[in-house]
Amino acid sequence: MFKKGFTVTAYLFLAPFLIAVAIFFFYAFGRALYYSFTNFDLFHPPQLIGLKPYRDVLADPFFQRALANSLVFALVTTTLQTIFALLMSVALNNRLRGMAFFRSAWYMPSITSSVVITLIFLWLFQRRGVANYLITQWQAYQPLILTFLGVFAAAQMVQVLWERARRLPAGWLDPALAAISALVALLLTWALNFTGVIGVREVPPFDYQYFADKWITLGGVKVLSIPLLVVIIQNTFTTVPTLMLFFLAGLQNIPRALYEAADIDGATPLQKLLRVTVPMLRPVTFYVVTVGLIGTMQMFDQVAVIGSAAPRETLITLAYYVYTNTFQAGAAPVNMACAAAIILALIILAMVFLQRRFFVAPEANS
């Protein structure tokens, strides 16, 4: 009797969630699937017309560009955010004083509204934005910067070779030697600037339009637009902190004995990362990549906020294509929007299936 009552109570608590899923997922998916085979346009009752909406969608140049943009965006962004999230989690996994503060600080971009972040990036990459300003300053101060870096590298090399000649341990990035090299480079650069040998150059303001119709091409084929590249940078910036938490949780489950054994064998930090950390985090990496692919293939809000600030072809994604076909003036081709949404769902499903089939660790299947 107690077990039966307990089961009923559990289902009562689950009922609101199950009802919401049934209405907003299964029912909505069923309606979208039905409309994708009709001529529905919001003004006339739907009539079945077979696969014509799918043929129209696949033949639409904007859909083809949206599909290409979505695939490139998903592959590039997922790769970048996975790599940076892993490296950041390894860096923040050290037991140092104040590490909790840095973990919280690095997580801030993920709790900030994506709309706000998009507006900030629009400001950063406008024609008179911070990006162009920094490039202008780099061009103006390039002689001083290159001189400083060259003197620093030379001084560091001389010090390291001198210490090793005296049979003393010295690394190329030894902090004490690096401080001396930086001081020498700073003094010499100042002296050369003071005597007029080198100095700040007069350069025109760097004027690059990041949200124009500009593309990175491969063999004459448009691969990645510059506006979409800006969105990739922004999306990576906002999603890395969240994915970092998954890697941090996975790092806690790696036995310390493995790292101790690697230290005994004389493994370098890079070897420990590639031979110990990465293999042990493979199930977590599968989850991170899966979440990343699903999220990036459905990316919509950043493109919607940018809107007309960039040409439509440079930023349109599958999710934005569905939106623009659903909410437009006149008889909106909702059937084409539904067909595109079904195709997007099938692509995501295929990606996850292939990844689970070929790239997941055996432990994740158990």
Regions found by a protein language model. Give the residues of each.
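Interhelical loop and adjacent transmembrane-helix boundary motif
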Residues: F6, D41, D56, P61-F62, ...
